[in-house]
């Protein structure tokens, strides 16, 4: 499974929205990126505030069948983590399911969503949008009311805004997704599970999580299973969490 085309956009509303509109122009797997995204949105409907030229916004679109499409965000977090380590020497942690943290602050957000295409919209695909904070100053996070956000530059990385966005987009395409997708499409999340668990900041910490009935549960996160669910040990037994908000003690100010 190869990425057939990577398209650079000087500006767009949202790379995910662009991919939805142009999905059929790409092959089985395609990608698009920009450093100027004016109308993005985050997980659970949150707005992703634009910082022109100082962040990378990248979306990969897949129409090939995947063994476990719901776990693509977890694979994506590993892909980005590896490329940031190679480029900048940083050791990011993953806050389940797919936020990347550096020194306890969010540096990468990932948003995956399904898309329909083709005759009578019978085709099914998946989009994976990634936002990487490269060089926003602290004033950006203050003005955007993002107290738990940071950028690579704020954490001491040397950022070249002329070269780095293109390099990262190319690296994500060639090594982050292109190679792992062969395995992921066939075998799902299981081959990547141990690497994910080793980087997951939730494991061993107390977490609170949303319940299907609208309530909240709490316990210690002890595992991530082969379906990508966070396993939480509660007073009443184990819960396998796959959707909703999860707060982690000591992260983002959670107690």
Which role does the model predict for each range below?
Residues 65-67, 74-92, 102-255:
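Long, positively charged amphipathic alpha-helical accessory segments at protein N-termini or as interdomain linkers
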Residues 1-90, 106-108, 115-116, 254-255:
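N-terminal lobe of the biotin/lipoate ligase/transferase fold
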């Amino acid at each position: 499974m190869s990425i057939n085309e990577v398209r650079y956009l000087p500006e767009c509303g949202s790379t995910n929205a662009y991919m939805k509109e142009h999905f059929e122009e790409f092959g089985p797997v395609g990608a698009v990126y920009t450093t100027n995204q004016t109308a993005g949105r985050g997980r659970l409907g949150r707005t992703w505030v634009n910082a022109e030229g100082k962040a990378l916004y990248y979306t990969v679109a897949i129409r090939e069948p995947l063994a476990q499409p719901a776990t693509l965000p977890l694979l994506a977090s590993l892909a980005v983590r590896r490329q940031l380590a190679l480029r900048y020497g940083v050791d990011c942690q993953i806050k389940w399911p797919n936020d990347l943290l550096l020194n306890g602050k969010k540096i990468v957000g990932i948003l995956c969503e399904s898309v329909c295409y083709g005759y009578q919209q019978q085709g099914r695909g998946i989009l994976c949008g990634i936002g990487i904070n490269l060089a926003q100053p602290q004033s950006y996070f203050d003005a955007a009311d993002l107290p738990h956000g940071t950028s690579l530059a704020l954490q001491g990385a040397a950022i070249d805004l002329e070269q780095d966005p293109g390099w990262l987009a190319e690296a994500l395409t060639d090594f982050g997704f292109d190679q792992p997708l062969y395995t992921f499409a066939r075998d799902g999340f299981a081959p990547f599970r141990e690497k994910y668990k080793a980087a997951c900041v939730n494991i061993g910490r107390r977490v609170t999580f949303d319940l299907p009935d609208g309530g909240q549960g709490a316990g210690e996160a002890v595992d991530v299973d082969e379906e990508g669910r966070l396993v939480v040990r509660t007073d009443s037994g184990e819960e396998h969490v796959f959707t909703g908000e999860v707060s982690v003690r000591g992260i983002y100010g959670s107690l």
